[in-house]
Amino acid sequence: MFAVIKTGGKQYRVAANDLLKIEKVEANVGDIVEIGHVLAHGEGENVTFGAPFVDGALVTAEVVEQGKNRTVIAFKKRRRQNSRRKIGHRQLLTTVRISEILLGGAKPAKKAAVKAEAKAEVAAEAAPKEAKAKKEAAPKADVTAETAAAPLFKAPKGEPDDLTVIKGIGPVAAKDLNEQGIITFAQLAKLTDKDVAKIDEHMPFSADQIKDWREQAKELAKK
């Protein structure tokens, strides 16, 4: 006899004595756990399907081991922002051996210590709420970080120059430079190689672009 069960948001086809890795169940090694979400059961070609679960059907399993899955690496990179993030995750797993497939409300031979699907459902419901809370908190953190971040350079007093006169600097680039404290041709002309490297690291402009603007700014600053 086999059964199709649902636990931890996944479906498994199981039979007696099968070894199975499911999402972590809070139980000790040797404990019996109950899986009451039985979607179908059958033997050979005779299969009974539930709507969605089969009434009175129950699968019990013995906890064999508590462990973790292999590490999954998530790598995120944002173009032209020099932002890279690497996150590793290891899913907690419980290895169980299927003990019995019970039908018609039959009672298990051994009393279960815990119901597997109950724990899995609580974890599954908690995960979206936690993710939503983090998602709502993220924009606030970004706004705080942006507010707290100081410009790369100190803007001089006086009237700013029109940086768009320099070939290669458009309105958007000029605005970005102004926000970082660069507002005059003289500033651009006096940029050191160290300053160029700083802009290259923190702004979406290449070192070659900045050096070209610096040379143009030197000529404009003389006028």
UniProtKB/Swiss-Prot annotation:
Cysteines paired by S-S bonds: none
Keyword line: Ribonucleoprotein, Ribosomal protein, RNA-binding, rRNA-binding
An example Gene Ontology CC term for this record: ribosome
Gene Ontology MF terms in the entry: rRNA binding; structural constituent of ribosome
Pfam families: Ribosomal_L21p
Assembly mode: Part of the 50S ribosomal subunit. Contacts protein L20.
NCBIfam families registered for this protein in UniProt: L21, PRK12278.1-4
Family: Belongs to the bacterial ribosomal protein bL21 family.
Reported function: This protein binds to 23S rRNA in the presence of protein L20.
Listed name of the protein: Large ribosomal subunit protein bL21
Naturally occurring in which organism (per UniProt): Mesorhizobium japonicum (strain LMG 29417 / CECT 9101 / MAFF 303099)
